[in-house]
Curated annotation (Swiss-Prot):
Name listed for the protein in its UniProt record: Protein arginine N-methyltransferase 7
Catalyzed chemical reaction(s): L-arginyl-[protein] + S-adenosyl-L-methionine = N(omega)-methyl-L-arginyl-[protein] + S-adenosyl-L-homocysteine + H(+)
Species, as recorded: Mus musculus (Mouse)
Gene Ontology biological-process annotations: genomic imprinting; methylation; spliceosomal snRNP assembly
Localization annotation: Cytoplasm, Cytosol; Nucleus
InterPro entries hit by this protein: Arg_MeTrfase (IPR025799), MeTrfase_PRMT7 (IPR014644), PRMT_dom (IPR055135), SAM-dependent_MTases_sf (IPR029063)
Subunit structure: Homodimer and heterodimer. Interacts with PRMT5 and SNRPD3. Interacts with CTCFL.
Chief location: cytoplasm
Family membership: Belongs to the class I-like SAM-binding methyltransferase superfamily. Protein arginine N-methyltransferase family. PRMT7 subfamily.
Gene label: Prmt7
EC numbers, comma separated: 2.1.1.321
Length: 692
């Protein structure tokens, strides 16, 4: 059965109705899931297996039958571990129907159908009794309900319900306990992801400073956690202000509460500085004695950094304090972790708070609109003074006396740069009400509300009256649009340039004047694992899961790239970067598709995991901004990526085939095509068999 789905096209800006298979969402969720990453997490799998064996043994030693409840079973892996360890029966709960169906097949293939019952329900809907899903309460509770924040996937309510209704009072739990850790730091880099810094512009009249409105400075920021691969943040980017502090623990073998709570830890600052950011992670102990431990600690907090396990399904958290506060070395302070049923947040206090008073402190929520419009990488991009200087220098070369500028980018400061650098009149278009209001406030606090005209409408709908009857001599864009997911989605600027053609003066300048799509073939240190088949996991056959992921990838995404912030995922270039397509913004969009075919020679040995693609914008003939590679690769090929942008990764089909040898074909062929009508860029990269 086919269904019609309405989707906003991020490149053309139009609303499209697409005919999709009724199971499209299922396939998309499977294709973009972390199931493969979890199966490749050997440390996790081994520790769970050890903990399960120990729990089953403790129950058997008491002379009891081992009845297991496995919540969030996924592939059924942990249930199969339990049965192999000697459990008498296992009830495996999985709410996602396609996953539950796969678990049934995997359990059957491994010969455990007589000992494992897969139940396709949310655990809070599971019943116990003669006519229930379980005949009696279980005495072993196994779960994998955790996300990077520990409780963000609803672990606390699920545990709370399970203890009340599904498991015995003295049950064994795997994991047995979780502990959340925090470390207070000062970090201009990370703080720049949360606050708008003053922006400096050198002009003929001296330095001008663009300042943020007071409501932006007071705003506590976005409520969602910032989860990143903290091991990729250089220690030079932050100053440690506290030891690693154990903030709170949850004992999963006892009744768990999902009620709001707070936990305070007094500490003595290791250094004086501005307390801005809390780095946080957790570990889980699989047994009551804490001998079997799985930790998410970054390398500097590991007892043995050499044994660091890479994983993408669990990372580390960055929390921003509502406001930065000075701390003095040796002067005690109190860090407080607050949580409700799904979220964690932090505050810094002078004394230990009364538990009851702070338990219900309201979770920080953005009230300035900026954190709803700009994500954290975008804040970092706007705060990048070198980037601002680059745009300012380019503007100086194209601005002329009497220039009438039209700026088209979401929530951009370009219009203010243009004004300060001498434009006679500046218009800026903000499509959303939120960005319109935000920019009005920023202009007002900088006394520019009468200098820059803000137009709240889609740029395609601009009229001569909106521009006060004037013709535009300089069309500006970064370009940046909040709807863009992949690098080339910002080609929406080209569509806007085409639609406003009648408002441009003869000889009008467009900045950027052109864009180009670039690619390089890479070998990832670890990211390949999220798309690599597992086959066998701790002795269990999970090929069915591999096939399921491959089918979902083939369903829609086999020829699509996916966005990843590659500064978090180290890789080596195996080829030289190559320009694939160019787009001339000085001209309207052509009617016919643009295609590029070619071959990329592999100049370094390694496993070709995929092609990385990014956009470069030629602001002027002598000035270019890259959203991808920002430095030439070093001798070994190590890549340095723009930290404010996501790059596009096209995983080669060989990433899904472990049989391809390391030193296989020495070139990659490609076909890339831009379709002006839809704004789509279709592509195919494949290893060329140069050996035959």
């Amino acid at each position: 059965m086919k269904v019609f789905c309405g989707r906003a096209n991020p490149t053309t800006g139009s609303l499209e109705w697409l005919e999709e298979d009724e199971h499209y969402d299922y396939h998309q969720e499977i294709a973009r899931s972390s199931y493969a990453d979890m199966l490749h997490d050997k440390d996790r799998n081994i520790k769970y297996y050890q903990g399960i064996r120990a729990a089953v043994s403790r129950v058997k030693d008491r002379g009891q039958k081992a009845l297991v409840l496995d919540i969030g079973t996924g592939t059924g892996l942990l249930s199969m571990m339990a049965v192999t360890a000697g459990a008498d029966f296992c009830y495996a709960i999985e709410v996602f129907k396609p996953m539950a169906e796969a678990a049934v097949k995997i359990v059957e293939r491994n010969g455990f159908s007589d000992k494992i019952k897969v139940i396709n329900k949310h655990s809070t809907e599971v019943t116990v009794g003669p006519d229930g899903d379980l005949p009696c309460r279980a005495n072993i509770l196994i779960t994998e309900l955790f996300d990077t924040e520990l409780i963000g996937e609803g672990a606390l309510p699920s545990y709370e319900h399970a203890h009340k209704h599904l498991v015995q009072e003295d049950c064994e739990a795997v994991p047995h306990r979780a502990t959340v850790y925090a470390q207070l730091v000062e970090s201009r880099r990370m703080w720049s992801w949360n606050k708008l810094f003053p922006v400096r512009v050198r002009t003929s009249l001296g330095e001008q400073v663009i300042v943020p409105p007071s409501e932006l400075e007071r705003c506590p920021g976005a409520p969602s956690v910032c989860d990143i691969q903290l091991n990729q943040v250089s220690p030079a980017d932050f100053t440690v202000l506290s030891d690693v502090l154990p903030m709170f623990s949850v004992d999963f073998s006892k009744q768990v509460s999902s009620s709001a709570a707070c936990h305070s830890r007094q500490f003595v600052p290791l250094a004086s500085g501005q307390a801005q950011v809390v780095l946080s992670w957790w570990d889980i102990e699989m047994d009551p004695e804490g001998k079997i431990k799985c930790t998410m600690a970054p390398f500097w907090a590991q007892t043995d950094p050499q044994e660091l396990q890479w994983r993408d399904h669990w990372m580390q958290c960055v929390y921003f304090l509502p406001q930065e506060e000075p701390v003095v070395q040796g002067s005690p302070r109190c860090l407080v972790a607050h949580h409700d049923d799904y979220c964690v947040w932090y505050s810094l206090q002078r004394t230990s708070p009364d538990e009851n008073d702070s338990a219900y402190q309201v979770r920080p929520v953005c009230d300035c609109q900026a954190h709803l419009l700009w994500n954290r990488p975008r804040f970092g991009e706007i705060n990048d003074q070198d980037r601002t200087d680059h745009y300012a220098q380019a503007l100086r070369t194209v601005l002329l006396p009497g220039s009438v500028c039209l700026c088209v980018s979401d929530g951009s400061l370009l219009s203010m740069l243009a004004h300060h650098l001498g434009a006679e009149q500046v218009f800026t278009v903000e499509s959303s009400v939120a960005s319109y209001r935000l920019m009005k406030r920023i202009f007002k606090v900088n006394h520019l509300e009468d200098k820059i005209s803000v137009i709240n409408k889609r740029p395609e709908l601009l009229t001569a009256a909106d521009l006060e009857g004037k013709k535009v001599s300089l069309l500006l864009g970064e370009p940046f649009f909040t709807t863009s997911l992949l690098p080339w989605h910002n080609l929406y600027f080209w569509y806007v340039r085409t639609s406003v053609d009648q408002h441009l003066a003869p000889g009008a300048v467009v900045m950027p004047q052109a864009a180009s799509l670039h690619a390089v073939i890479v070998e990832f240190r670890d990211l390949w694992r999220i798309r690599s088949p597992c086959g066998d996991c701790e002795g269990f056959d999970v090929h069915i899961m591999d096939d399921m992921i491959k089918h979902s990838l083939d369903f829609r995404e086999s020829r699509e790239a996916e966005p990843h912030p590659l500064w978090e995922y180290p890789c080596r270039s195996l080829s030289k970067p190559q320009e694939i397509l160019t787009f001339d913004f000085q001209q309207p969009i052509p009617q016919q598709p643009m295609q590029s075919k070619g071959t990329m020679e592999l100049t370094r040995p390694g496993k070709s995991h995929g092609a990385v693609l990014w956009m470069e914008y030629q602001l002027t003939p002598d000035s270019t901004i890259s959203t991808g590679l920002i430095n030439p690769a070093e001798d070994k090929g190590d890549c340095c990526w723009n930290p404010h942008c996501k790059q596009a990764v096209y995983f080669l089909s060989t990433t899904l085939d472990l049989r391809v040898p390391l030193n296989g074909p020495r070139s990659v062929s490609y076909v890339v095509e831009f379709h002006p009508l839809t704004g789509d860029i279709t592509m195919e990269f494949r290893l060329a068999d140069t050996l035959s």
